[in-house]
Amino acid sequence: PSTQLVDMYEFKDGRPFNWDEIFPGYNAMTPEQRKELLSVEMDGSGTIVGLREADTAKILSAYTCRDPRLMATVIVPYSHYMGNIGRTTNVDLIFALDHNLAGNANGGTIQNNAGWVSYLYRKFVTEGDQGGAISNRLHTPFAFPLIRFADVLLMLSEAYNEAGQLDKAVTEFNKVRARVGMPGLNSGPAWMVV
C-alpha cells in the first residue's frame, strides 16, 4: 500500500489525518529527516537492537488514533503480525523500519516515499501457516469474499448520489462508517458536513 493510501485514513473523530499533529514539523521534513525520526537499528536477523531517536509507541499511535479500518487493512510500522516464511511454526513479528535498509529495485516493500517508508497489506492476506500454499487462494482455509456488504452499501450510496438523493446517499454511507464507530457525515463537526 502507498503512503498516500495510508494517509487518507482519518482521525477517529473524522478529521483529515495530518502528520504534523503527531510530530510537529513532520510535513516539512526531508525523507532523510523522517527516516531519522521513524527508524530503529536492526541486526541481520531482524531483531531491533537500538531505538535511535524513534519513539515506537508514539509512531504506532499515529496509526491507532485513526479509523480502525486502517489497522485491519494495513500492517503499519511497529505493529504485530503473524509470520511463517521459512519456519515450521508461526512467529509473532513486529514490522519495524530499519535505518540501515535502503530502497532498491528488488525490494517491492520499500519503494514508496523516496525508496524508504512503506507498509504491508493485512486485509485479505493470510498470516502465519494456514495449512496451504500462500500462492494459491484455493489451497488455504482463508475465505476470500467475492462481494462485501460494505461494497453493496457504498454502491447504493453512489446510486442515490447520482440520482440527486443526497440524504439517502449519506444514510447508506454512514452505515459503513457506523460499523467501526466512525462519525457519520453531517453528524455535527464542520469537517463532517457534505
Provide a role label for each language-model segment.
Residues 1-194:
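Acidic/polar-rich alpha-helix caps and helix-coil junctions
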